[in-house]
From Swiss-Prot:
Organism of provenance: Corynebacterium diphtheriae (strain ATCC 700971 / NCTC 13129 / Biotype gravis)
Similarity-based family: Belongs to the acylphosphatase family.
Protein name per its UniProtKB record: Acylphosphatase
Reactions accelerated catalytically: an acyl phosphate + H2O = a carboxylate + phosphate + H(+)
Origin: domain of life: Bacteria
Lineage of source species: Bacteria, Bacillati, Actinomycetota, Actinomycetes, Mycobacteriales
The UniProt record lists the keyword Cytoplasm: no
Amino acid sequence: MHDADARLTAWVLGTVQGVGFRWWVYSQAKELALAGSASNLVDGRVCVVAEGPKHLCEELLRRLSAHDHSGRPGRVDTVVERWSSPKGEVGFRTR
């Protein structure tokens, strides 16, 4: 059975700016072959948008949220997620 594509928007709160967090997200998304972006927000959060097979988006969310994820820079306190239909993102970029 083919996994349907999905769009994950995740707002990540913690010590996630100025520590290489967006570049880490980029590497995880590329490893999972997801499209989207990781952007710093003015309030200190990082917004992660990822599109691709839902199970791979769920894996990225698990990596973002995991308390024991070694190698992830910074500190993640909270991740708020929203799921929606994909909009046709191509490639993955940091902003």
